[in-house]
A protein has these predicted regions:
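Interface amphipathic segments
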Residues: 1-216
Length: 216
């Protein structure tokens, strides 16, 4: 562990944890080394966490105190709007911190195994999200071979983008012909609106025929 601080705004931590053994009633886990690299100053916050094929990175403008304050203000704004049942996307966007968070992971790491222990399985996850009080929320989330509560989804692709004053999103869920449960393709398009969210969904069967079309 390497720790440096001025006991004010500047803190730096670099650490490696190894030789860890975690026991549950069913299995014993011996995760590979966990490496953490965290830096925060008045003008920036940077964090990296690596463990096997798990790689998480976060970079934001401003120190950790400013980041926590912005997140608290964002939460307060969202909760207030939900209570009033009226969404003001511009007001929400003003509270976004300026930052980016990326995640790539497979199954060969302690965190994925812990998630699996809790009943969720996946092959790979790839996420890239960017927030800004000017450009809003933009990014993607890709998941391959997701199993949740006994339901297997072969491919999940989701995107979020801010266009003008509106946050829009798309999603595609595909189960190929080798899926043992259901073969289908679902497409979702939507955007946040003042009174909630406008959603359009289409579901195609194994032959590519449109089976369900829903607009809310």
């Amino acid at each position: 562990v390497d720790l440096k601080t001025n006991l004010k705004e500047d803190h730096y931590l670099q650490a490696m944890l190894g030789s860890i053994v975690i026991k549950t009633q069913q299995k014993e886990y011996r995760p590979v080394d966990i490496v953490a690299d965290v830096l925060t100053r008045r003008d920036t916050t940077h964090a990296v966490l690596n463990c096997g094929d798990f790689h998480l990175r976060m970079d934001t403008h401003g120190g950790y105190k400013k980041l926590l304050s912005r997140l608290d203000e964002l939460q307060g704004e969202v909760m207030s709007q939900l209570k009033n049942r009226r969404i003001d996307q511009v007001a929400i966007r003003r509270e976004f911190p300026l930052g980016r968070i990326t995640l790539t992971t497979g199954k060969d790491n302690f965190i994925s195994r812990f998630i699996e222990y809790n009943g969720y399985h996946f092959k790979t996850v790839d996420m890239d999200l960017r927030t800004s009080p000017i450009s809003g929320l933009n990014g993607h989330l890709n998941i391959d071979s997701l199993v949740a509560q006994g339901v297997q989804l072969d491919t999940v692709r989701a995107n979020v983008m801010t266009q003008g004053d509106t946050i829009r999103y798309t999603a595609r869920i595909v189960n190929n012909k080798k899926n043992p449960q259901y073969v289908f393709q679902a497409l979702v398009d939507g955007e946040l609106a003042e009174r909630g969210s406008d959603i359009a969904a289409r579901i195609y069967d194994a032959n590519g025929k449109l089976g369900v079309r829903v607009g809310l």
